[in-house]
């Protein structure tokens, strides 16, 4: 994976002439998890260098797919993905490779609280994985979602040349409106990832580990009763690593590039 290049003109054309003419249900057709995105079937995901992309830079965008947040994946595919990518590329990120994930609630017995795409460089393949996300639309009344599943997968099931060759951390962004699940139960990791661990994993400890190779951020939809959730996120991640977005997500096209560009280190031969 990771071949091809991103064409913002072609992507923008598809957004306006294809995706914007469709309903959310027509774009996101999945009625269950796509087998290619099922973490139980995935041993490892890789972001690798190639002759075409010698300085790969991994970016994970993990989207809350529960009932209150389905408008954000829709917004990204219909409106803002070309703007996000164009901003990143124009700012000098040479070889961005983007993975989309879907995040739900593993405490509410969702079918697919974690869905994992591939790292891609081309517009068509990024769109392929984004539209494969199953918008399960559930989530419970427990006031949190299982965002740490994205951290766990990145920490245990992703390898990148950016880190192994250049000690360049990737960027991992979760987007949602709930608080963060405090503990991943070992039974949940077994059920949804086929990973057998000896004990439950405290999310704050997991965060310490994943931060060794990833710059971790959260973009928070901060409307109404969800304002308290942002405070919880700030206590966990730290000030400046949690960014509030408009309820309609209209400013996400500016927020995501800003976070990414703040972490990117240009190759030495480009400086």
Residue ranges of each PLM-predicted region?
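Extended, composition-driven regions rather than compact fold-specific motifs
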Residues: 111, 159-162, 181, 185
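Von Willebrand factor
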Residues: 52-116, 121-169
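Acidic, polar low-complexity linker/tail segments
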Residues: 6-60, 67-74, 78, 86
């Amino acid at each position: 994976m990771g071949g091809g290049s991103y064409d913002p003109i072609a992507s923008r054309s598809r957004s306006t002439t294809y995706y914007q003419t469709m309903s959310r249900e027509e774009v996101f057709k999945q009625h269950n998890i796509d087998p290619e995105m099922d973490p139980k079937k995935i041993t490892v995901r890789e972001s690798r260098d190639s002759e075409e992309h010698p300085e790969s830079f991994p970016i994970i965008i993990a989207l809350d797919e529960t009932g209150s947040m389905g408008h954000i994946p829709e917004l990204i595919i219909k409106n803002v993905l070309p703007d996000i990518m164009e901003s990143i590329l124009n700012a000098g990120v040479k070889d961005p490779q983007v993975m989309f994930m879907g995040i739900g609630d593993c405490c509410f017995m969702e079918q697919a609280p974690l869905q994992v795409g591939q790292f891609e460089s081309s517009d068509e393949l990024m769109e392929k994985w984004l539209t494969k996300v199953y918008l399960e639309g559930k989530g419970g009344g427990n006031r949190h979602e299982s965002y740490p599943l994205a951290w766990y997968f990145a920490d245990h099931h992703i390898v990148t040349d950016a880190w192994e060759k250049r000690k360049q951390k990737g960027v991992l962004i979760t987007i949602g409106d709930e608080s963060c699940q405090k503990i991943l139960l070992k039974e949940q990791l077994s059920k949804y990832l086929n990973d057998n661990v000896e004990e439950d994993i405290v999310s704050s400890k997991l965060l310490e580990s994943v931060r060794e190779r990833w710059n971790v951020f959260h973009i928070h939809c901060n409307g109404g009763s969800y304002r308290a959730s942002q405070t919880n996120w700030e206590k966990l991640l730290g000030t400046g690593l949690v960014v509030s977005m408009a309820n309609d997500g209209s400013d996400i096209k500016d927020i995501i590039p800003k976070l990414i560009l703040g972490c990117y280190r240009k190759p030495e031969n480009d400086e």
